[in-house]
Regions:
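Non-catalytic nucleic-acid-binding/docking modules located in mid-to-C-terminal regions
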Residues: 12, 20-43, 93-98, 146-147, ...
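Noncatalytic, basic helical substrate-engagement surface that gates or grips nucleic-acid strands
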Residues: 12, 20-22, 26-177, 181-210, ...
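Short hydrophobic beta-strand that contains or immediately precedes a catalytic carboxylate
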Residues: 48-49, 176-178, 384-386, 505, ...
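Short active-site loop/helix that positions an aromatic residue
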Residues: 55-61, 184-189, 393-397, 509-519, ...
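A short, charged helix-loop
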Residues: 202-236, 550-580, 589, 593, ...
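Conserved "right-hand" nucleotidyltransferase catalytic core of DNA-directed polymerases
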Residues: 282-479, 497, 506-508, 516, ...
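Conserved catalytic core of nucleic-acid polymerases
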Residues: 571-574, 621, 628, 735-738, ...
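C-terminal polymerase-core module
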Residues: 647, 651-654, 658-711, 879-927, ...
Length: 1015
């Protein structure tokens, strides 16, 4: 909603010289051109913006593909307004600025009830999005300190007209910013009309209207615009005009007779019949139309220049809003207001001169004799924050690969604004005859494999990057500390490994693995700011340091691209000059140190600190061990699978061509669309901007309707995906140094608390189909060992029984029988021995549908039954398990009241969707509120089990190691002689990870490959 209107309303906001623009900034866009000399405002300028019209245009400019946040908030209008303001103020730098809004119905509606009545009403969903956008824009304007002006009973046009008149009378040059032709009537000496055009590479140039060119657009001078519009009307506002009078006739009449009354007086003598009769018949309508289009200039509203004067923006508030709206480039571009305190080592400056930049003490420690003082300072700090910088091995297929990287330097922060950089493996690039010369003054080794990469990168590096500018200026030779295994570095190794020295990091698992490869076992980890952010709000779009710094300490980080360039042109970190690397790494460590101060109190206040301390943090080390260990694959099997998959894909291709009636490019959506919907005339239920959709849901729907081709297309897509994702990719990702596959587990991605894995993703290999089982058959143990897999049985249903405490559900699990058979017996009202396989299958589907909040529509599609029958099943289910329904309802109610739900272990998930105006979004929020405690508790359980199992394996000095976590399953590599012991250990720890009202059951199996563990 807009701020409430009063007689004269101005909500203060401001600041333009410091406004920053987004990437591909339109600030220098030609759409804001310099006006012609003859029409240039030369004095003190007052810009009056027709705000509502601009917002409306920005909202609908992206209506087919709106900008949205991760949480679904439509940001199109907000983005358009910010973009516009930045272009306008950067190009024109006004001294005074006002943003003018309508205040609701005006006197024109009373005078003519049909005024604007033809405007199309927005749908409920669009209206909700528009209203939310208006609220955000008011926040943005307030942060910019731009006054929002309106007057009850009048339109923005009247407010602008009144203020423009007063401004011109007081000697100001007034610029009205609008694309509305009505404003041309206000143009006079010292009053201009500026149509802002559109930004972007295909932008429409702005246009200026002044007294010199005021007649160009409409063909009449500004003083006769109302007379002209009185006759032609205005369809956008439903101003009737005079039927039978067109634009040319109206221009001719104005040119010959002048104002409307003179034209009406001359009407009887007009020689042309049509305009004569029209004017005689509709004279009063013409007078009414002129009244409607005439902008008032005499409202009881004084021009208050102190209010309108451009002021400094509230950058902290702007950054907060931009982060919330995910305008991250804009947020980073705002001036930095980070305040830090410098604490110096002996020899540091005693005082730092006052400056607008952050106060920092970032020191390069590149000599062994400096280390002792720095290490002593670190040991006296309450905690230290660490950062590692690396170069990835040339043979790694990944850009960031902790297990195939070499350590270049370490950043250590001991207090806000105080950090130290320890260079270990920097090389030097110096300018030489327009090129860069790779040097090695430091004495550090430079592999032959790295040299060509360095030379190539140096030639292509963007001169705009910090490192490239430093190199071009002539960086000093790189000095490095000895390698970490040198005897002189023993104190540093001791500090990093000492569990008594508290350490924090951002993405600590990465640093842990990097240091392990360098021979260091990181000890004393007490916090990880990325994990802390995740526990505080798992729904946050990103837990990256740059966004956390913006949101929590109002600081814009230097990015890797800022430092070293981007893409293939990016400099490797060991080629970045040490002084640049120091500032970059120290900033990361420094910000991490400060974020820890922010997050720990919040975790305690939120009652999530125990989950963070006892589950998420210990799991970091467990996952690091799992990733370090890796898993072996049978390369010969994958080679044979590649041949088999190729044959299968070719077979399906031929069947597709037969079903389609000819060959076509199966991977081309336009060609596939033509075959499905033009050639075969299949029904289309979903459209995109380019035509009927061919996505998986459409193919599934067509396949269920009995059409052959969609079935084959789905099979083809599955084969292609398995082939590219696993058959081709997995062998290529094997680490040549270990001969094993090392996945990366992500702790901060899934809002439920579940882990995910990437590079490669080993959690989505299908198990129910033979093709997926063939891929799993390629995962094997070392010689003399077996794979052991332990899987929670029906963990989510058991958790639902515990959380709901439904007597029938709890009893079904305590009896130890088949839960789906027992459910079928209850909902179909038959004895256990009378349950058929079909009844059990339906009961199983209903059990899991309950967890995920599926309604009758989704269930009817799954079971392929009528909607009414599915609805009856659900009603019968909840009649038998009333406690389940009460629990699910109470979970949604709790979420509405508190804004979040919790797991058994107090993990929170915030659900803002419950407050959304959109019904579908709210429904999603309700389903999320119902199932998140169940899914999240399952995630917590297996994490606790992983920690306990790892601890026992180490404590009992067993060789067996955990290799994978796949949802509710853990996979181990176990020597034959340890199999019995480890089987019992794993089963015990998983089944006793928590005490529930129903037993936890774990199925354990072993075999010579992953598939055999299930037999």
């Amino acid at each position: 909603m807009l701020p409430p209107a009063s007689i004269w309303q101005a909500v203060l906001f401001s600041g333009y010289d410091s406004m920053s623009s987004p990437q591909n900034s339109p600030v220098t866009d030609p759409t804001f051109s310099t006006p012609p000399v003859a029409t240039r405002p030369a004095g003190q300028r007052l810009f009056l913006i027709d705000g509502y019209a601009l917002i409306y245009r920005a909202f609908f400019a992206l209506i087919s593909r709106p900008l949205t946040t991760a949480r679904g908030e439509n940001t199109s209008a907000a983005w358009g307004v910010v973009n516009f303001l930045q272009r306008l103020t950067s190009a024109h730098k006004p001294e005074y600025l006002g943003w003018v809004h309508d205040s609701g119905l005006s006197f024109r509606h009373e005078r003519y009830p049909a005024y604007k009545a033809t405007r199309e009403k927005l749908t409920e969903e669009l209206q909700n999005d528009f209203d939310t956008g208006m609220e955000r824009i008011c926040q943005i304007l307030e942060a910019y300190r731009v006054p929002v002006l309106s007057l009850k009973g009048y339109e923005a046009d009247d407010v602008i007209g009144t203020l423009a008149r007063q401004g011109a009378e007081q000697g100001l040059d007034v610029v009205i910013v609008s694309g509305d032709k009505d404003f041309q009537q206000l143009v006079r000496n010292h009053v201009w009309l500026l149509n802002p055009g559109r930004g972007g590479p295909a932008g429409v140039e702005e246009s200026w209207v002044s007294v010199e060119n005021g007649a160009e657009r409409l063909g009449v001078p500004p003083s006769r615009v109302t007379d002209y519009l009185a006759m032609v009307g205005d369809s956008s506002d439903n101003v009737p005009g005079v039927k039978g009078i067109g634009e040319k006739t109206a221009r001719d009449l104005v040119s010959e007779y002048g104002d409307l009354e003179a034209i009406l007086a001359a009407a009887p003598s007009l020689t042309k019949k049509r305009p004569r009769e029209a004017l005689l018949e509709h004279a009063e309508l013409a007078r009414l139309s002129k009244e409607l289009v005439t902008i008032k200039q005499d409202l009881p509203m004084p021009l208050e220049l102190d209010v309108l004067r451009v002021k400094e923006a509230d950058h902290a508030r702007l950054r907060q809003i931009f982060v919330e709206l995910e305008f991250n480039t804009l947020a980073r571009a705002l001036p930095d207001t980070l305040v830090a305190v410098a604490t110096a080592l002996p020899g540091a400056p005693e005082a730092v001169a006052e400056t607008t930049r952050p106060v920092t003490y970032y020191v390069t420690v590149d000599r062994v004799e400096q280390l002792s003082a720095m290490l002593q300072r670190a040991r006296t700090a309450p905690y230290i924050a660490i950062d590692t910088q690396t170069v990835t091995d040339p043979d790694s297929p990944q850009k960031i690969d902790a297990l195939r990287s070499s350590l270049v330097g370490i950043g250590i922060s001991v207090a806000p604004g105080e950090a130290y950089y320890l260079p270990l493996r920097h090389r030097t690039l110096q300018p030489l005859q327009g090129d860069f010369l790779l040097g090695d003054e430091s004495g550090a080794d430079s592999t032959e494999a790295a040299k060509p990469r360095a030379k190539r990168a140096s030639k292509q590096a963007e001169p705009s990057s910090i490192a490239a500018r430093a190199i071009a200026a002539g960086s000093p030779p790189a000095l490095n500390l000895p390698s970490l295994d040198d005897p002189s570095m023993v104190e540093l190794r001791a500090l990093l490994e000492d569990p008594a020295v508290p350490k924090v990091a951002q993405n600590s698992k990465h640093h842990m693995l990097v240091l392990r490869r360098a021979g260091i076992t990181l000890g004393g980890l007490v916090s990880d700011t990325m994990l802390a952010s995740y526990v505080l709000d798992p729904g946050r779009r990103s837990h990256g340091l740059d966004l956390l710094a913006l949101e929590f300490i109002d600081h814009a980080m230097t990015s890797q691209e800022d430092l070293a360039g981007k893409g293939k042109q990016q400099l490797a970190f060991d080629l970045v000059p040490v002084e640049c690397a120091r500032d970059f790494s120290c900033e990361i460590a420094d910000v991490t140190w400060q974020l820890e101060q922010q997050f720990r109190p919040q975790l305690v206040t939120q009652h999530t600190y125990e989950l963070y301390r006892d589950v998420e943090l210990p799991l970091v080390g467990v996952l690091a061990d799992v990733e370090w260990e890796g898993i072996q694959i049978d390369r010969s099997l994958f080679a044979s699978l590649k041949e088999r998959f190729a044959r299968e894909r070719q077979r399906v291709e031929q069947e597709i061509y037969v079903a389609a009636g000819g060959e076509f490019n199966i991977n081309s959506n336009p060609q596939l669309r033509e075959v499905l919907f033009d050639r075969l005339k299949l029904p289309s239920s979903k459209r995109t901007s380019t035509g009927p959709s061919t996505d998986a849901s459409v193919l599934q729907e067509l396949a269920e309707a009995g059409h052959e081709l969609p079935v084959l297309l789905m099979e083809y897509r599955e084969l292609s995906k398995l082939e590219s994702t696993y058959i081709d990719a997995l062998p290529a990702l094997v680490n040549p140094h270990t001969g094993r596959l090392h996945t990366s587990f992500n702790q901060t991605v899934a809002a439920t608390g579940r882990l995910s894995s990437t590079e490669p993703n080993l959690q989505n290999i299908p198990i129910r189909r033979e093709l997926g089982r063939d891929i799993r058959r390629g995962f094997i143990p070392r010689d003399g060992s077996l794979l052991l897999a332990a899987d929670y049985s029906q963990i989510e249903l058991r958790l639902l029984a515990h959380l709901s405490n439904d007597p029938a559900f709890v009893a079904a699990f305590k009896s130890g029988g088949d839960i789906h058979r027992q459910t079928a017996s209850l909902i179909f009202d038959v004895p256990l021995d009378g349950v058929t396989s079909e009844m059990r299958a339906r009961a199983k589907t209903i059990n899991f549908a309950t967890i995920y909040g599926q309604g009758a529509h989704a269930l009817s599609r799954q079971l392929k039954i009528a909607h009414s029958e599915a609805k009856e099943f659900i009603e019968r289910y909840f009649e038998r398990f009333q406690g389940v329904r009460e629990y699910l309802d109470s979970s949604v109610t709790y979420a509405r009241e508190h804004g979040y739900v919790e797991t058994i272990f107090k993990r929170r998930r915030y659900i803002p969707e419950l407050r959304d105006r959109n019904f579908n979004v709210r429904a999603f929020g309700e389903r999320t509120a119902a199932n998140s405690p169940i899914q999240g508790s399952a995630a917590d359980l297996i994490k606790i089990a992983m920690i306990n199992i790892r601890d026992r394996l180490l404590a009992e000095r067993l060789v067996a190691r955990m290799l994978l976590q796949v949802h509710d399953e853990l996979v181990f590599e176990v020597p034959l002689e340890e199999l019995e012991v480890v089987t019992g250990l794993v089963k015990h720890e998983m089944e006793n990870a928590a005490s529930l009202s129903v037993p936890l059951v774990v199925d354990v199996g072993s075999g010579r490959n992953w598939v055999e563990t299930k037999h």
